[in-house]
Amino acid sequence: MKRIIVILLCITLVGGMVMTAHADESTLDFFKGLNFDDGLSVVVEVFQRFPLQYGTTLGLDGHPQIRPIEFKFEEDGVLYFDTVTFYTSYRELQAHPYIQLCVCDQETMTYVRLSGKVNFTTDQSIIDRCFEASPVLTSQFGNHRDVVIGYYLTEVWAEFASFSDELPNKSWKLLNKYDIAE
């Protein structure tokens, strides 16, 4: 049921998606050029091309909550994001540390979903990288870095799905160094 809600919200919100400029390459060509044998690279490249993702958390009221979020960076197979300590989403993720992200392309009828367990970090080098990766974060919280907290995902599962006959449907379990250490 929760997966259906996320997919429906993803499809509903696709009109509001922001895409970075790639005038020399169609979106279909971009997708065709992905290395589908490497799920991590698919996720990273899609999230970089479509910098605004929609993330779903389990709300404090027990209902799904969806909001725009921004992938920050990948390092050594680990996907990093951030939030702000006074946001409701931070409290939700503390109470229920799982998130699902979705980004969609209406033109090719293609989407990427990613889910995983949220692990917070106060490592200043990670938070600094989040600021480096995001002009929005810097403009909003550059003078208040103390309220920003980083997080990375473990137990990551990703799916690339398309209604286009020219693209595959694939899913991956993306283990990283923190999964292996557990």
Residue ranges and their predicted role:
Residues 72-109:
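A short mixed-secondary-structure module that forms the rim of ligand-binding clefts
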Residues 1-4:
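Positively charged n-region of N-terminal signal peptides that target proteins for export
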Residues 45-60, 99-103:
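A short, Trp-centered hydrophobic/proline-enriched beta-strand micro-motif
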